[in-house]
Amino acid sequence: MADEYLVPLDQYLAAGVHIGTQQKTKDMKKFIYRVRQDGLYVLDVRKTDERLKVAGKFLAKFEPQSILAVSVRLYGQKPVKKFGEVTGARAIPGRFLPGTMTNPAVKNFFEPDVLIVTDPRADHQAMREAVEIGIPIVALVDTENLLSYVDLAIPTNNKGRKALALIYWILAREILYNRGEIQSREDFKIPVEEFEMKIVRR
């Protein structure tokens, strides 16, 4: 059915995909479902799901190695790295070196055809360079983000460990499915836990 979720609604909720922040921007108003009594804005998971479907189809059109996914945020680093391994995309977890996309003298210089950012605010350097070279930007966006220069927004909790793992897992699966590399979504056998940043307890 066309209105079915990519994963059960309970799985989205358990991962906290819908949990926003206590700030909202005008840009994000259309993605907000409600505000809780404690002032926390809650995202509309249906819209998250819809955007993941669109993003999967869009990204599947690119050569795998021409996709760049980045995450300065700690909890996005393992998901981005695993996403790269699974889809063939280039991944930069951690610090994004200025000039990576714009300065051929930089050691790991790379000109992608599309950029995926985990958080427009944290990944602002990568976004700035993507705008400079004129490539589309797919962004995971929370309630306090702005959509300036974002071509395709995926509304989600972009700070939570489990939320980021689930979003990148779904996105990887959707890309493989839309490329025809798997015949059905059930053929994607990699557990979501492999996308999840582990907490090191001292």
From Swiss-Prot:
**Key words, A-Z:** Ribonucleoprotein, Ribosomal protein
Name any GO cellular component annotation. small ribosomal subunit
**Gene Ontology molecular function, alphabetical:** structural constituent of ribosome
Ranges annotated as spanning the membrane: none
The GO biological-process annotations, alphabetized, read as: translation
Top-level taxon: Archaea
The family note in this entry says: Belongs to the universal ribosomal protein uS2 family.
Summary of subunit composition and partner proteins: Part of the 30S ribosomal subunit.
- What this protein is called in its record is Small ribosomal subunit protein uS2
Q: What is the lineage of its organism?
A: Archaea, Methanobacteriati, Methanobacteriota, Thermococci, Thermococcales
**Source gene?**
rps2
